[in-house]
Amino acid sequence: ANRGGPLHVYGPPGVNDIAEGSWLVTRPDRDIRVADHEIDPEHMRIIPHLYSEGVVFDRNGLKIIAIEVDHGEFIRPAYAFRVEYCGHVFVHSHDTRYNENLIAQAQEADVFIHEVAAATPATFEANPRAKIAIDHHATPQDVGRVFAQTRPKLAMLTHLVLLPPHPMPIG
């Protein structure tokens, strides 16, 4: 409520639809807040900014770079991010397979967070579709190669997916 204007949101293709959809679905709540709290409705608006590979944001010493990565044939575009601030570099792979473009941008990062996914042979036998999901991500071996090639000061894993051989029922 203390924001002095609209919220600026940066995103890939589709961000305009998300901003417009959010504006539409929050109308009842927004109307109440405008009436009850005397909030300027324009301060509740989302202003979308579409980005592609390259510099997304560069202001007051903070630089954010989108790095196109490979998250599968049908999931395009997909981006990793490099954040530079006060002489430090943070890189986050987001969802990706092994990717040379990411490796080039992640050299000697202070912090490099990379996703990883794996499954046992029993998982693939019990659920052949599991291979489709796993093929969209970096394997533990891939991530080991990435960290060896980029030599970050701190390497971390995220999106730790280890699919079980048999799906667990819900409920």
Residues covered by each model-derived region:
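Binuclear metal-dependent hydrolase catalytic cores
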Residues: 1-91, 169-171
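Cap/insert and terminal regions of metallo-dependent hydrolase folds
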Residues: 9, 80, 89, 97-171
